[in-house]
């Protein structure tokens, strides 16, 4: 009787996208933090702006939430929650650059399924809102969400971070130590926000930028810088 053959092993290249996804992260999550700027009329815009970009082999979307509709409050701190979904990143960043604002892109490498999960999070927000078809262009779709905007949140920073956390749950771990409204807001503004309960989490773009620059709990792939004064 022939002797039994020893076990043989060989490496087989997978054709299963899910297996490839688990082994080779190839998507990017970018937290885009825009700095303050001075408008052409001399008005100072000191609060900055945050948006979230999800880039994979199948899509490249930038989620840009802000006070792009009716506003209210003493300082215009609340209003309609408008989400702009850009399918053309260059069109988005061109608009930011036109303000002579510097935008820092904090880039994280993620798996495709993480990017899809974050994309689905925003899809649910859009589903619960209303598309403003009159504002749609070849580069962007615009939606009025069911939840209004407020300076303390939901705002551009908190919504971007919430979306990022779907993909990277610990991306804001430790950020509460950088929640320092006094770095940006004057006394009157801080008192007005305190009357609304104060900030329970990091909500200002400048504070987010400092946190990601100094204490990001997740390793950055790189940091890109867009725009600035020419």
Regions found by a protein language model. Give the residues of each.
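Aromatic sugar-binding interfaces of carbohydrate-active proteins
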Residues: 175-184, 188
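Active-site nucleophilic cysteine motif
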Residues: 47-49, 146-178
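Non-catalytic ligand/cofactor/substrate-binding and regulatory segments of enzyme domains
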Residues: 2-152, 185-230
